[in-house]
Amino acid sequence: MCGITGFFNIENSLELALRALETMRNRGLDCIGICGAGWLEHATDTESLKFQQGSELNVLGHRLHSMVNFVRQPIAYRGRLVANCELYNWKELGEKYGIEAENDADMLIKLIELKWRELERARDTGSPDPSVDHDIPETDVLRMLDELLAEVTGVYAFAYWLGDRIYIARDILGIKPLWYSTSGGFAFASEKKALVPTGRTDIKELNPREIFGYDLQNDTVTTFNRSFFSIQPEHTQPVENIKVDFRSLLENAVSVRFPDERFGILFSGGLDSTVIAYLCKTLGKKPGIDFTCYTAGLSEVQLPPDVEYAQRMAQELGLDLKVKRIGLEEVEEYLRQVVPLVEDTNVPKVGVALTMYAACVAAREDGIRVMFSGSGADELLAGYDRHKRSAEINRDCYADILKIYERNTYRDDVVSMNNNIELRVPYLDKRLVDYCLKIPAGYKMRADTNKWILRETAMDLGLPEELSLRKKQAAQYGSRFDKAIGKLAKRAGAGTKTEYLKQFYDRHNLKLGVLFSSGKDSNYAMHIMQEQNYSIECLITIKSQNPDSYMFHTPNISLANLQAEAMGIPLIEETTRGEKETELEDMKNAILRAKKEFGIEGIVTGALYSNYQRERIEKVCDELGLKVFSPLWHIDQEKEMRQLLSIGFDFIFSSVAAYGLDKSWVGRRIEERDVDRLVRLNQKIGLNVAGEGGEFESFVLDGPMYNKRIEVRAMEVIELDEYTAKVNITDAVLVDKD
């Protein structure tokens, strides 16, 4: 793929664009291009560029990783385009619209300009100057782009500039990255790190479900919301028909991604990557085009599980496999590259990135420029352990796909592109995703078997039953790189793996606000994010006047300010009547205040199992351009309760409302023996151990991030009936910790 950037209404745009292109050097080594309003230059490197006179307020830049023909960018016709794209149906689009194009990017700009002319003819502008936009309403242009992109099959991130307008968009799943800033003009780039050195402070990731328009003359922004996939209507055909359709779509997703040159496959020997490799072997490659599988792991006496299994599968299926094994010292050197690349010290994220990076290094040494990945199968087909605890599997799959751009695709893109390798992800094919989200949950999770339909497909293909039944192991564990990070952290005297990784990336991952209820879940979720090097800028508390609110915790919520003081974190409070129609708007106002006052980039929630809460929070945050983190999502409830106690949280039950509980539970500290009792009640009557069914609410008195603890000096216990009681804390103060 490629790297794109642009700077508009900024005095030193040319200098900033060149700096951004240099930061993204490995995204494209075939050509570099840059243009302004009246000039365009291409060269093999920045030193060879020769600039003509022209305005430097507005500049587009591009780094080319050429895969289909050799078309330099920016491309200039009536307007100008920079694109990081791989469009698999560009030839079909050319036939449909009668357009001759040299490659997919060339097709994209020609198609945009064809559609633009249609808008002009509909308005009969009659202007002879083709270089201006003729005052077509912004909403019409954005809608046209949305309709055009709906016809495109593939992945992309692009910018189109015509006259006083520029538009940016990315594929609907966010496989190709795009970041932007609107502080003092407008800037964008394929990677966040390309904008950081330019002094931008409000860098945001473009939501793939938005098309973004910028008016140069008025310095204004317009966005257009794109429709996403749906889990309805669910497929009702017999299961054998669904299996046939699924296999056909998967085979097509693989075959359309075949490049015209030798390629690689990220291979763990697990279900997802082995199915991809087997299909690549059997679908009929082009003459002379072959592939190699690559896997990586820690070099130690015992083979890492993924390396051992990859070797067995490769031998059994006749696959060409190369293994990259690295020792502890080399792991540390790789971490110096990987952690700044992914711009994160999140331990699982770094572990996965390290595994991929090592495999990509081996592929790069072989001259590989395209690799296939099995990414997306777990999100699409319920492949994680947490899916086994889900009551609404397809809604969870939908949420995973909706947010996959925040969690996985940017990491994978920057790691592969740093090795000058384009990553292709068949499981995230648009048609396949649309189909799979509507597959009945029972065909994804059957008994205790996840990804059931993919396992069935593997057996239908003739793959070994052993493979089809193999349980998933995350890449960082299967490669043993997580173990290596642990050893390095211990050797360095770091308290945690995150502390050790901070030396490679000294910034906080993101600035976050916490939807703070005063209870155990929001407190624990915040602690987890702090431990992962996220900066907690503020707490956000919604004080509901409705005691029966499904959205917001109400017991003793007025004491959230005391908890905030104990932690030394600012608190934003918003009162709501708790009416279903208005409480989300009140929450949105509070989060918007946090964004404006503290510059937060995301929200932390303590959601465990409530889709009702999580989906509404995600909808609000989507509208505000914020990411959502729910680190407790689908955690085992007994595990959560025991972890809270083991790491030093001190909390009481502030209310109870369930058979098996009574007033003796409220107002006193919860201990291990109480968790034992809750577990027995769960076994006997199905009571939720962590109170997820509304059995109880909690109030935190102390925790690892509290500088002082809360001492309750007076409280009132109110018994409503035999199984329902609550406590009102009437006097509480902060005291020094022992």
Task: Say what each PLM segment does.
Residues 511-550, 555-559:
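N-terminal beta-strand-loop-alpha-helix module at the start
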Residues 28, 85, 212, 314, ...:
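Residue-level signal for inorganic ion chemistry
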